[in-house]
Amino acid sequence: KLDKKQTIKALLFVTYDALGNENGYVAAFIRGDRELNMTKLVNALNINEYAIEFADEEKMSKATGCVGGFTGPMHLHDCKIVVDSELPGLKNLCAGACETDHHYINMNYGRDYEGDIVVDIKTLKEGDACPICGAPVRHARGVEVGQIFKLGTKYSEPMKAYYKDENQQDKPIWMGCYGIGVSRTFQAIIDMPQNHDENGI
């Protein structure tokens, strides 16, 4: 049985423009035992979070040559290929052949396939090397006390909310949604050992 670490996993997406029209397909490839980090993928594509979703595989197949669970980085066309930065350093991997019930073995980056974008798009696991310092990553529970949603021009375009740039040209306002959880922030502070005892706060 083949170890998942020796396989390439494909995830297929469709992207949209600011008006909600389909704007091309994306095939993201990661090591078989890894999980995709959508935030990293969105940043790599330089698009907004709302501008991408999983593709209708049958529809995408007609346009790009992908085949459901048998999609690999070879024989794809008319789509952007994003390869996780871990894959180029791995040798002799197994990947889908874009043909039902068929796979390729001994796949190597550069010789057999390439990506339009090669960047870190995986979710780090406990024990993985930190991409900044190299130390093993350790997971810990946290409390979300704030959040940001990048809305881009999703609402400003249809609302015609424009501003004048330095050339006096109308440009859509880039919007965001920002939240701070005041009550949960206080709760998190109180939960810290130095901020409460058996008598309370």
Locate each region found by the language model.
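Extended, low-hydrophobicity, polar/charged segments
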Residues: K1-T185, M192-I201
